[in-house]
């Protein structure tokens, strides 16, 4: 119903937002001048903005919709007759999830995680806005490419482009191999 549509929209939203908008929202949430960021910083000693953790958070938020959409599709493809049969045998919902649903959705989840990882390593906009581009601290491969191109070092930019292409291609090939083995 409406609640599910709301959560689905919220979990998918980072996929359609401009990355700089997502980065700005993260800045507002995690700033030490805001309640959540202040709590993390003062109560737990965790600083997120302009740190390597900020890079991870930004890339994860941007990539999450890919994982979520794949996992959701995998769970939706499960034959409900199998679930109904398990219920008629008296199997608890907890066991149905762990022993039937999760194993049946495993390939979709793995594909989603792999696609999300491939997307996360190429993230630029939200990471730049939220974590910055601090050399040796928060610089990502995508930021490094932009930096060396701006300085005219096309050879280094080419090297880093090849690295990202190789990692992304390896992710896609692994998804195809994993999904191909299941057929």
List the predicted regions and their residue ranges.
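Glycine-rich helix-loop "coupling/hinge" segments at transmembrane-helix boundaries
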Residues: 27-28, 32, 126-152
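Membrane-helix/interface signature in polytopic inner-membrane proteins
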Residues: 72-83, 93
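Glycine/proline-centered hinge or cleavage motifs at structural transition points of membrane proteins
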Residues: 89-90, 103
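Membrane-water interface segments at the C-terminal ends of transmembrane alpha-helices
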Residues: 1-76, 100-125, 148, 157-180
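The alpha-helix within a helix-turn-helix
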Residues: 86
